[in-house]
UniProtKB/Swiss-Prot annotation:
GO terms for molecular function: alcohol dehydrogenase (NAD+) activity; zinc ion binding. Belongs to the zinc-containing alcohol dehydrogenase family. Class-III subfamily. Keywords: Cytoplasm, Metal-binding, NAD, Oxidoreductase, Zinc. The keyword Oxidoreductase applies. The lineage of its organism: Eukaryota, Viridiplantae, Streptophyta, Embryophyta, Tracheophyta. This is Alcohol dehydrogenase-like 3. It comes from Arabidopsis thaliana (Mouse-ear cress).
Length: 394
């Protein structure tokens, strides 16, 4: 890749030009990385509901177009900017939307993974260095003239492109012999779910759990709880078609709210003798959050917020409901510090501690990205892997 270092690269990217507008595969220019930045050739990328939410324009504050979405991927370092020491040309890496500088007070503490400078920020659309973008395209103006049009970044990553530029804090080196398609899942969904069970709730062997929402993240929570030896994993979802997949992730009981004549939390309390030890809310619905909280056992029950909440509604709890010892906490990227902890997690996945294969339900070429979005919208896909670039040799 030496022939492209320090030069602008012209490549293909899927650009979204407005809410709910089909993505356009088009030619863009990708600038060289600046200080503490890395330019990566993307090999595979998958689609997450967060991509879908931004494409939908669900949160007006997040709207910024044109934009390159995508944040779950795996790729090869093409070149690095000044000061980058931990990765080099040819390294296999995964991008992470939540970075780790290793220098700030948060990175130096065990209690949090929210780096002061590179933590996840859905409103962020430019690079930290200079407040500019590294993507652009040419648009035609009236009268036949043309001009360069900047294209915004997304979640510190932007992976629906053959080449992307990231802050080095958001690039994690992985084993070159790892299964690349599966490794892309660690950029978001699987790490977020498994980490919520391992790092945030700290699920113990023999304990009971309830997972509300059996999408990719919810199933990853279940898989994490299974790997930790949970004796009972209750899956809650209104889509009965998800239950079969849940069995592969260790779910022992299934509840479809549509089949009940009583609140879900009441049913869970009845079948568990008072409530579960841990509950996980993975839908981003505050009403479901209340059910998840009330499904935990008085005195020690713990509820973890994993879903994204786009609405301005507040937490539907009375302070006295916390008085009895139940807890509620949030989770970002499963509590994983990406650079210092994700490589070990990847090794555990390679050893089979966590099963990654069942999460990949579809594979499509890059040019079929709009079909992949439709599969997710229709609930027919957990993770659809897109081949962005060809891997010539390994």
């Amino acid at each position: 890749m030496a022939e492209t270092q320090g030069k602008v690269i012209t490549c293909k990217a899927a650009v979204v030009w407005g809410p709910k507008v089909p993505l356009v595969i088009q030619e863009i220019c990708v600038d060289p990385p600046q200080k503490m930045e890395v330019r990566v050739k993307i090999l595979y990328s998958s689609i997450c509901h967060t991509d879908l939410g931004c494409w939908n324009g669900t949160n007006e504050a997040e709207r910024a177009f044109p934009r390159i979405l995508g944040h779950e991927a795996v790729g090869i370092v093409e070149s690095v900017g000044e000061g980058v020491k931990d990765v080099k040309e040819g390294d296999y890496v995964i991008p992470t939307f939540n970075g780790e500088c290793g220098e700030c007070k948060v990175c130096k503490r065990e209690e949090s993974n929210l780096c002061e400078r590179y933590h996840v920020d859905p409103m962020k659309r430019v690079m930290v260095n200079d407040g500019g973008t590294r993507f652009s395209t040419t648009i035609n103006k009236d009268g036949g003239s043309s001009q360069s049009q900047p294209i915004y970044h997304f979640l510190n990553t932007s992976t629906f492109t053959e080449y992307t530029v990231l802050d080095s804090a958001c690039v994690v080196k992985i084993d070159p012999n790892s299964p690349l398609k599966q490794m892309s899942l660690l950029s978001c969904g699987v790490s977020t779910g498994v980490g919520a069970a391992w790092n945030i709730a700290n699920v113990k062997e023999g304990k009971s759990t309830a997972v509300f929402g059996l999408g990719s993240v919810g199933l990853a929570v279940a898989e994490g709880a299974r790997a930790r030896g949970a004796s009972r994993i209750i899956g809650v979802d209104a889509n009965a078609s998800k239950f079969e997949k849940g069995k592969l992730m260790g779910v022992t009981d299934f509840i479809n709210p549509k089949d009940l004549t009583k609140p879900v939390h009441q049913m869970i309390r009845e079948i568990t003798g008072g409530g579960v030890d841990y509950s996980f809310e993975c839908t981003g619905n505050v009403d479901v959050l209340r059910e998840a909280f009330l499904s935990t056992h008085v005195g020690w029950g713990s509820t973890v917020l994993v879903g994204i909440y786009p609405t301005p509604r507040t937490l539907p709890l009375h302070p006295m409901e916390l008085f009895d010892g139940r807890r509620i906490t949030g989770s970002v990227f499963g509590g994983f510090k990406p650079k210092s902890q994700l490589p070990n997690f990847a090794q555990q996945c390679m050893k089979g501690v966590v099963k990654l294969e069942p999460f990949i339900t579809n594979e499509l070429p890059f040019e079929k990205i709009n079909d992949a979005f439709q599969l997710l919208r229709d609930g027919k896909s957990l993770r659809c892997i897109l081949q962005i670039s060809k891997l010539l040799k390994r």
